[in-house]
């Protein structure tokens, strides 16, 4: 039996168990259609050892990507460097506003999408693969400039249908285990799943260094992992489905401060 299958079966059986138990530290939402009452970052669900790793910039491996991103930001490629248009201060607060509806492209884009727009439109370079190291360098460096700042995505106007699509995705059961995101992250957070605390599934730590990956990765990669865990068909990185879900998750986080590069298990 493969690792993903074993993990998925463990998840299903554990969820049946936690729903049969009295609530622990979690308070199940009275209205599952609304965001949780008190959003908590994944930071609150870490072991003491992992928490210490995140808090120490010298021990947090994610800062290796941030440092590489600082160099990539200054590097002349194509028609010039990112720094030719943006000094480092100009990046402060930028990551808090994504995903957002882009008027020129007439679609929703996240920070990685904005990086690729700059590459193709300004630097005359091909778009980066969304999980490529250079993309992770740049996205982690830019997001780090907004560390500690609250998210502030727009959900009005043309972004509104995207939010609804993301919400629908969050509540939709999927996969052979027939589970929805909200069953773990709204209804069961704070309960134990095979020795680990179930978190609220908040996105504010990404790009994040995951111990399971032994590397830094994007939120969309984490979404793929979740869907694999319930034996569902995964969406493509950067797909409309994941962009909509990302918008919903950021809105659901209710202005949690950004932590990237976070460390997660």
Residue ranges and their predicted role:
Residues 69, 73-77, 171-175:
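Short, flexible, mixed-charge glycine/proline-rich loop motifs
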Residues 77-89, 138, 166, 176-189, ...:
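The canonical Cys-X-X-Cys-His
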Residues 82-98, 156-157:
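Acidic helix-start/capping segments at beta-turn-to-alpha-helix junctions
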Residues 237:
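Cys-dependent condensing catalytic cores that perform Claisen condensation/acyl-transfer
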């Amino acid at each position: 039996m493969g690792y993903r299958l074993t993990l998925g079966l463990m998840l299903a059986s554990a969820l049946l168990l936690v729903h049969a138990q009295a609530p622990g530290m979690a308070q199940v939402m009275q209205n599952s259609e609304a965001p949780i009452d008190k959003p908590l970052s994944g930071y609150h669900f870490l072991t003491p050892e992992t928490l210490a790793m995140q808090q120490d910039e010298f021990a947090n491996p994610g800062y290796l990507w941030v440092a590489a991103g600082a160099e990539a930001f200054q590097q002349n490629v194509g028609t010039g460097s990112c720094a030719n248009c943006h000094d480092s201060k100009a990046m402060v607060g930028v990551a808090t506003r994504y995903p957002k509806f882009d008027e020129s492209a007439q679609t929703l884009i996240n920070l990685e999408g904005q990086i690729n727009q700059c590459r193709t439109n300004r630097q005359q370079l091909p778009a980066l693969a969304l999980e490529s190291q250079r993309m992770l360098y740049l996205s982690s460096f830019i997001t780090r400039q907004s560390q500690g700042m609250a998210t502030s995505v727009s959900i009005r106007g043309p972004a509104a249908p995207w939010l609804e699509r993301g919400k629908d995705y969050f509540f939709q059961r999927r996969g052979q285990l027939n589970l929805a995101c909200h069953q773990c992250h709204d209804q069961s957070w704070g309960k134990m799943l095979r020795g680990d605390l179930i978190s609220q599934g908040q996105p504010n730590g990404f790009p994040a260094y995951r111990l399971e990956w032994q590397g830094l990765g994007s939120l969309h990669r984490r979404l793929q992992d979740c869907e694999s865990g319930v034996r569902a068909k995964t969406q493509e990185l950067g797909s409309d489905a994941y962009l909509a879900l990302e918008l919903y998750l950021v809105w659901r986080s209710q202005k949690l401060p950004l932590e990237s590069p976070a460390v997660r298990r």
